[in-house]
Amino acid sequence: MGEHAIKRHMRQRKPTKHPLAQKRGARILVFTDDPRRSVLIVPGCHLDSMRREKNAYYFQDGNALVGMVVSGGTVEYDADDRTYVVQLTDGRHTTESSFEHSSPSRSPQSDDL
């Protein structure tokens, strides 16, 4: 009888998430020549569960990036943020402008995740 009372008063554990659950896939951050325009592509979301964010797009399988084709721009990978930074240009691309926009922290949308 006393054993039943002890079990009833034990603290319930909260379920813990797997440590890799939040590290699924990588994000893709796309910049254009206009620093105010950017697109964030986020992994692992289904179309019916998309957040209503401006300029945010989602791809289904975030475990691996199979391939990326970029015409008229550059792609850099930031391992710390697990983010592919894509700089699109319209022919006026310079190395300096790519460097200015290559940091994901420069975009207000990159902090939303």
From Swiss-Prot:
Induction entry: A member of the dormancy regulon. Induced in response to reduced oxygen tension (hypoxia), low levels of nitric oxide (NO) and carbon monoxide (CO). It is hoped that this regulon will give insight into the latent, or dormant phase of infection.
Stretches with biased composition (Basic and acidic residues): 90-99
Region (Disordered) location: 1-22, 90-113
Amino acid composition bias (Low complexity), ranges on this chain: 100-113
Protein name: Uncharacterized protein Rv0572c
